[in-house]
Regions:
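Glycine-rich, aromatic-flanked loop segments that form ligand/cofactor-binding clefts
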Residues: 59, 122, 127-154, 275, ...
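Active-site core of metal-dependent hydrolases
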Residues: 195-316, 323-329
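Divalent metal-coordination and catalytic microenvironments
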Residues: 9, 25, 30, 52, ...
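Divalent metal-dependent hydrolysis catalytic cores, especially in the metallo-beta-lactamase
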Residues: 91-116, 130-140, 190-203, 231, ...
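N-terminal metal-binding scaffold of metallo-dependent hydrolase/deaminase domains
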Residues: 1-41, 55
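Active-site metal-binding motif and surrounding structural segment of the metallo-beta-lactamase
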Residues: 38-56, 80-81
Length: 329
């Protein structure tokens, strides 16, 4: 494999806050083997001049749904697109992510009927396409009428469409049924298991404070996944739901933006991994074109208003937890 000697005008290592200047880097194949100011260029290395640029480690998008393109697909999850089109969307989005500096994307549940997301991941891993590498949970596990059941948007206005919208999502009830779903995700190549354990903001039929799976169902999912050595990631917002999930053995919490300081300390002390996703609940910056963002439903807006004070309070708790840097993915 080729060897490169890269001269970086500005260099940020992702560990220290300072940005260094005039740093050299030696890359052998896919591995950075040395970084420093006074490195000599190996004879067999190709010189790459990035003196006009700032060089950073690859970014990680830790919470993404990449099977869509465009802001108008959210409420329907682009249900009219075939699985083949969604697979192509994922490959396209992986390349766009890489061009923007993201080398790894964690896909936390998709709207595929099948497992095209795994095909996209493998095609990129094999070098058929250039793009960010994927870490994938193909289908998030949820309950009827819960956070992952977006068919409820249409159940009273278009029942046939609503019934069809249930098909891409891993929605069921009962411990044995959830065991089956976990085993199926693993069979087709899941890197981790995602649970929609509680309600959310975007879903129309629930509340972020609702716990949606009972303990038997949660234990069935967690124990089945751990038997196969797959980590379990849970969508949850409130302290009660997060503390129960930690007690039952989940490996990571997504969101958590309604939790108390006590719960944040529990996450830190138990070394639970945590992805806050603060951006999705914050107002856009002034220079952002809001027409490019997915529209928020009336239900979403009502919930934001209901939890406005708690979101602001918990945001400071979350930021303090993120600053500690010990458990953040």
């Amino acid at each position: 494999m080729p060897k490169y000697y890269i001269h970086c005008g500005r260099f940020f290592d992702g560990v220290h806050e300072d940005i260094d200047e005039n740093i050299n880097m030696i890359v052998d194949g896919a591995k950075i083997v040395n970084v420093g100011k006074s490195l000599e260029k190996p004879r067999d290395a190709v010189f790459v001049d990035l003196s006009q640029y700032t060089v950073t480690p690859g970014f990680i998008d830790a919470h993404a749904h990449y099977e869509f393109i465009g802001p108008e697909t959210f409420n329907t999850f682009s249900i009219s697109d075939s699985d083949e089109m969604k697979t192509l969307n994922m490959v396209y989005n992986a390349r766009q992510a890489l061009l923007k500096g993201f080398t790894t994307v964690r896909v936390t549940g998709t709207a595929f009927l099948g497992f095209g997301c795994i095909d996209a991941k493998r095609a990129i891993d094999k070098g058929y396409f250039t793009g960010a590498r994927f870490i994938v949970a193909p289908h998030a596990l949820g309950v009827p009428g819960g956070h992952w059941d977006f068919s409820i948007f249409y159940c009273n206005t278009n029942p046939m469409f609503s019934e069809y919208m249930e098909q891409p999502f891993a929605i069921t009830s009962g411990a044995d049924m959830f065991k089956h779903l976990v085993r199926k995700q693993i069979k087709y190549g899941a890197d981790f298991i995602k649970i929609m354990a509680a309600g959310g903001f975007a879903s129309p039929g629930d509340d972020p404070g609702n716990m949606q799976l009972d303990q038997d169902e949660l234990c069935a999912i967690i124990n089945t996944a751990k038997t196969a050595e797959k980590p379990v990631v849970a969508h949850a917002y409130t302290s009660d739901s997060i503390e129960l999930l930690i007690q039952l053995g989940v490996d990571e919490i997504e969101h958590g933006t309604l939790m108390s300081e006590q719960t944040a300390r529990l996450i830190e002390n138990k070394q639970i991994k945590y992805v806050p996703t603060l951006f999705s609940l914050m107002p856009p910056d002034d220079d952002v074109d809001v027409s490019t963002l997915p529209p928020k439903s009336d239900a979403f807006i009502r919930k934001l208003a209901k939890y406005d004070a708690q979101l602001k309070e918990s945001r400071e708790v979350v930021l303090d937890l993120v600053k500690c840097g010990k458990t953040l993915i």
